[in-house]
Amino acid sequence: MAQASNSRIKVGIVGGTGYTGVELLRLLSQHPHVELTAITSRKEDGLPVADMYPNLRGRVKLAFSAPEKASLTDCDVVFFATPHGVAMAQAAELLAAGTRVIDLAADFRLQDTAVFERWYKIPHTCPDILADSVYGLVELNREAISKARVIGNPGCYPTTVLLGLAPLIEGGKQLVDVQTLIADCKSGVSGAGRKAEVGSLFSEASDNFKAYGVAGHRHQPEIVAQLEKLAGGKVGLTFVPHLVPMIRGMFSTLYARILPQARDTDFQALFEARYADEPFVDVMPAGSLPETRSVRASNNLRISVQRPGGGDQLVILVVQDNLVKGASGQAVQNMNLMFGLPESAGLDQVAILP
């Protein structure tokens, strides 16, 4: 049963030392309906959170605790900001105690376990729970999320691609050629996480711009599965991610070929109508171009609809902060829905400029 909106939700975070973990802490420490009760890290057991993240001094007074010491089953909801495979190992125990689960990794994103195992190279150990889980893209699954016990929080790239293409294909619309969709996406280096890797070292990532995962990226099957669910049939997607030398931010340029019978469609009006009531999706005025800095540290996602030369190629530009709407902010948005809270609770931060 969803907790009443006038009581405080007891929240636990598993894996609080990475970038998505500290973003959860930043957002939840300002949330009017949340009580942070447990933050786990085996390596940092006993270390005050504020000692690792000084930006949280005076905001978060908890210390990290080893997972076995944390009373996670006493929480109303537990967020997993962990590597793939961790949430599925603990979900059954939490659910049995009445604790809800929001996983920021991929354990509950793909309903096909064979596809999951092929891309993530680990067995899926709780297919029964997976079948009961909900894909947590609020703007597409709001009603199901409000009733869910387990949420698979979407990946950062899928969030931009799905929200950028949904108005064109949902409900089987015959507006664009769904077999020739292209997603050309760029992410800041924080998307790679906080672990030490050569590719995200300053001397490697700075003053450099590169594509990666062109032959196949883990987010490809996630995007395709959700696009096909929206379209009601098979879709074809070319997805190419890139790494750009900035910390936060994601810019996705999406291409869709307009079908002959849809050439007279007002696509600007279509997008504006679709997202008119969405608190975190902003369709920019015709002719405007989005920038990643306009959404930095906020839960906002901005969309621009372009039709170069009035031709048959539609170009959709989408920006978000990969750590907020692309990860932790979206997870909090899901929590709000699950517990009957205002969707924007704790998420009304204005983007940082400059």
UniProtKB/Swiss-Prot annotation:
SUPFAM superfamilies (UniProt xref): Glyceraldehyde-3-phosphate dehydrogenase-like, C-terminal domain (SSF55347), NAD(P)-binding Rossmann-fold domains (SSF51735)
Leader sequence residues: none
Keyword field: Amino-acid biosynthesis, Arginine biosynthesis, Cytoplasm, NADP, Oxidoreductase
CDD domains membership: AGPR_1_C, AGPR_1_N
A Gene Ontology term for the protein's cellular component: cytoplasm
Known pathway: Amino-acid biosynthesis; L-arginine biosynthesis; N(2)-acetyl-L-ornithine from L-glutamate: step 3/4
Localization terms from the record: Cytoplasm
SMART domains: Semialdhyde_dh
Reactions mediated catalytically: N-acetyl-L-glutamate 5-semialdehyde + phosphate + NADP(+) = N-acetyl-L-glutamyl 5-phosphate + NADPH + H(+)
Superkingdom of source: Bacteria
Enzyme class: oxidoreductase
Single biological process term from Gene Ontology: L-arginine biosynthetic process
Alphabetized GO MF terms: N-acetyl-gamma-glutamyl-phosphate reductase activity; NAD binding; NADP+ binding
Entry-linked NCBIfam families: argC
Function: Catalyzes the NADPH-dependent reduction of N-acetyl-5-glutamyl phosphate to yield N-acetyl-L-glutamate 5-semialdehyde.
Family: Belongs to the NAGSA dehydrogenase family. Type 1 subfamily.
Designated name of the protein: N-acetyl-gamma-glutamyl-phosphate reductase
Organism: Bordetella pertussis (strain Tohama I / ATCC BAA-589 / NCTC 13251)
Lineage: Bacteria, Pseudomonadati, Pseudomonadota, Betaproteobacteria, Burkholderiales
Gene: argC
